[in-house]
A protein has these predicted regions:
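P-loop NTPase motor domains
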Residues: 1-2, 64-68, 75, 82-221
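Glycine-rich phosphate-binding loop of nucleotide-binding enzymes
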Residues: 2-75
Length: 221
């Protein structure tokens, strides 16, 4: 007989979908990836859209076998990500302001209220730019030069421009070219997850989760 499996708690058709509550645990080599691949393939029978955050390419074959797209993100190599390009509507600017405040945080020198307000102002300027080509990290950083903080915010932003130490993450492309199009999308994050730099991991993962969140919120097929 058929076994009716669901990843979610029971919901209602006239309400928001319930969150997923399925967790697979096991020791190395016990078949977690195989089971995940099987469940993913079965979910596709019902038309589910799948995003795979992969480690050591454990799901690559399953993603490709399901006709999906698969890409790798590696530390030190351009990612094609650029939140300045994508987060330009009302929801996006609110998220981007909070995210940048976290990204630029330093335990030894927390942001002042004036700096936080300045971030919000510049994010709005970025969203309203008449020329989309200005939505790059170097031009974005230049908007902080006039901030009355001794150049502190400007210097912090320069680390994320194309020539900065974190420039490989967001500073190498204008348009956000990291595509989530398709019913099955997988990306290998081994190089990011194995990175010893917490800030790099946080930057990449938090923005990737945001991109997926927007896809779900907007009900993009």
């Amino acid at each position: 007989s058929a076994y009716r499996f669901s990843y979610h708690e029971q919901g209602s058709p006239d309400k928001e979908p319930t969150s997923g509550h399925t967790l697979i645990m096991g020791r190395p080599g016990s078949g977690k990836s195989v089971l995940s691949a099987f469940l993913m393939t079965q979910a596709r029978r019902a038309g589910a859209r799948v995003f795979v955050f992969d480690y050591r390419s454990g799901m690559e074959m399953a993603v490709r076998a399901n006709g999906g797209r698969y890409a790798s993100l590696n530390a030190g190599q351009p990612t094609g990500l650029n939140p300045l390009w994508t987060e330009t509507d009302a929801r996006g600017t609110a998220w981007l302001s909070d995210w940048l405040a976290t990204l630029l945080y330093r335990a030894d020198k927390p942001l002042t209220p004036a700096q936080t307000n300045r971030i919000q102002e510049v994010v709005r300027q970025n969203a309203q730019a008449s020329n989309p080509a200005l939505r790059n990290w170097r031009d974005f950083a230049s908007l902080f030069v006039s901030t009355d903080d001794g150049g502190d915010l400007h210097q912090r932003l320069l680390e994320w421009t194309e020539d900065g130490r974190y420039g490989w993450i967001f500073g190498q492309s204008l348009e956000d070219t990291f595509s989530l199009k398709g019913d099955v999308v997988g990306f290998d994050l081994t190089g990011i997850l194995d990175s010893e730099a917490d800030k790099e991991r946080m930057a990449v993962l938090s923005y990737l989760f945001r991109r997926v969140e927007r896809e779900i919120e907007d009900r993009r097929p």
